[in-house]
Curated annotation (Swiss-Prot):
Its EC number is 4.98.1.1. It catalyses: heme b + 2 H(+) = protoporphyrin IX + Fe(2+). The gene is hemH. This is Ferrochelatase. Transmembrane segments: none annotated.
Amino acid sequence: MKQSKLGVLMVNLGTPDAPTPQAVKRYLAEFLSDRRVVDTSPWLWWPLLRGVILPIRSPRVAKLYQSVWMDEGSPLLVYSRRQQKALAERMPEIPVELGMSYGSPNLPDAIDKLLAQGVTKLVVLPLYPQYSCSTSAAVWDAVARILQGYRRLPSISFIRDYAEHPAYISALKQSVEHSFVQHGKPDRLVLSFHGIPKRYAQLGDDYPQRCEDTSRALRAEIALPAEQIMMTYQSRFGREPWLTPYTDETLKSLPSQGVKHIQLICPGFSADCLETLEEIKEQNREIFLHAGGEKFEYIPALNDDKGHIDLLEQLVRDHLSC
């Protein structure tokens, strides 16, 4: 029997090509037009998106991107590229490509590169530790849609998530412990996950449970009393209720409860990006300090840390034999 030619497709959400209103508008238009992300009827949503949201939000969001943009580009893309490079170096016998669900480098090009190299078994690795219909399932949809254009399809191994994987929890633990060594133990350790509308969970998305699974596993490994480790949700958008407790409201309330020193980690983000570097590290830090807090430390995403690359390699190798 002919041996399969293996390939790995790493996928993250995406980013604008530049911190400009025009580039941000293109990116947001693609992102917010995905029915997995916003499931409102297109007849209602698209006029609102194109007529109101994009013209108003694009300049505002562009300024936020400018505040975190790196010399090499968008933080999310920079760190994702580093992850791709590090994983490829671990597995030189297997081609590894990076594609973004929205923006560049795009998924069609990444898949085309892999298939052009003769890949017959494709491992799809969405860089989302906790499954959600709005992220992981959107990757599944996109890959299936792209492959409709090919006559010869590869077999596919899809990594749904890795919320409780021992190597993932170990990497998070190392990050937290490093922060404790640098800054001392805080009054509270906050685990902030990206939120989703409550309605999505009520319709069957198990994302909240997967966030709780990660939090429970991490609590068991951290040298803090369980009651000093909190789980919250950030980045809500729109008017409908999202998962609670909200990160910003929680941080605002903590100083009045005698909590003066917090450290915050975002376990659901595999790479630092606008939501971690600007929303959390800057905006939410100011919220906490303005409310009377005294010390706030943001614990960076796993990015291209060795422990994170160990995890990604183990995930891929586990699925190569499936």
